[in-house]
């Protein structure tokens, strides 16, 4: 939680390193060593605090420990993937754990880590596409760009062809068929 959050938005920092988690309850040293290492604290302040919402409904968000460590690990996997087979892996969180915001933090960090790639967020449901697009749109200042929703396969292709870097584009998998040619040959697209 942040200073403007209700008590229900506060959570414990339960890991020092992202590997082991004290599930019973958080210890002070776990919180202190997990969050207040100099480099990590500066990273959290720079990359893991954002504002979401609009107008009077705007609020500050601070990543939880599980989001911080998962996003940092995903960024490292993405860097490796660009030098190897191109496969970054799967990002998994339980329901209600802040997956959408983890994705926002990830997209934000990718811009620096991979030299301004285009991020394509592909979902299997229209309602999920709309939900994620709305969440990312509310965080456009943090992302330093305005997300776009592709309305068709042709629109997606033109969005990819019309840029050499940057962009966060939302689409559904229903716009594709098996055996199709790639929509782009660019190497700096993260799906």
Q: Model-predicted segments: where are they?
A:
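Hydrophobic positions in the central parallel beta-sheet of the AAA+
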Residues: 121, 169-171, 191
């Amino acid at each position: 939680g942040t200073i403007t959050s209700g008590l229900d938005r506060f959570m414990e920092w339960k890991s020092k390193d992202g590997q082991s988690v004290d599930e019973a309850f958080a210890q002070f040293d776990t919180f202190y060593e997990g969050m207040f290492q100099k480099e990590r604290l500066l990273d959290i302040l720079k990359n893991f605090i954002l504002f979401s919402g609009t107008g009077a409904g705007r609020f500050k968000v601070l990543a939880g420990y599980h989001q911080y460590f998962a996003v940092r690990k995903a960024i490292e996997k993405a860097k490796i993937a660009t030098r190897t087979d191109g496969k970054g892996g799967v990002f998994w969180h339980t329901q209600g754990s802040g997956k959408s915001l983890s994705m926002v933090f990830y997209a934000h960090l990718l811009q620096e880590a991979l030299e301004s790639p285009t991020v394509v967020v592909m979902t299997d449901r229209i309602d999920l596409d709309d939900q994620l697009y709305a969440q990312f749109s509310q965080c456009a200042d943090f992302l330093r760009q305005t997300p776009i929703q592709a309305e068709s396969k042709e629109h997606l292709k033109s969005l990819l062809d019309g840029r050499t870097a940057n962009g966060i584009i939302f689409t559904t998998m229903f716009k594709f068929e098996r055996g199709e040619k790639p929509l782009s040959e660019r190497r700096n697209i993260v799906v």
